[in-house]
Amino acid sequence: MKSSKAFNAAVAAALVAAVALTACLMAFPQLLGGQSSAVAETYEEKVFGTGGVLSVEISVKESDWETMLANATAEEYIVCDVTVDGYTVSTAGIRCKGNSSLSSVFSSDSERYSFKVEFDHYDSSRSLYGLDKLALNDCYADATYMKEYLSYEMFRSLGIATPLCAFANIIVNGEPWGL
């Protein structure tokens, strides 16, 4: 009988310790090397929570830009500075992205590519409010520019995890590139 009570007490103590440890790790995820929710909220709010059209300005050496577009399927990063709604991340990496859409745009002799921006590609300390990558999709074969956005919003409203998204007006070296 005594051993049964001791066993129950040990199990109860272990459960209390496990709950306390779990609560601490949830409150302080950086203890395990995780990203705190404050960082996630920062880019969620500042980049994707504006409710409007983002302004994305890309500054890049013109010859590098032309080479990247001419060799889009190589998916090679080039150095650029990216400004999103007034916040600049210098020395970021940018490349054309996609698979079938990249091939289709390339073979159609169009330059309306999707881009992948890696803010930390050349310097791991760089980010956009904690965001290290940004996809700029061209909405290829979507004349409405709405399908992807509405799909993400629909899934999000159903409680399904989806990528954050927003419309963006892209400007490259001071020239409009498109929405």
Language-model features, listed with the residues they occupy:
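Phosphate-handling architecture centered on phosphoinositide signaling
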Residues: 2-179
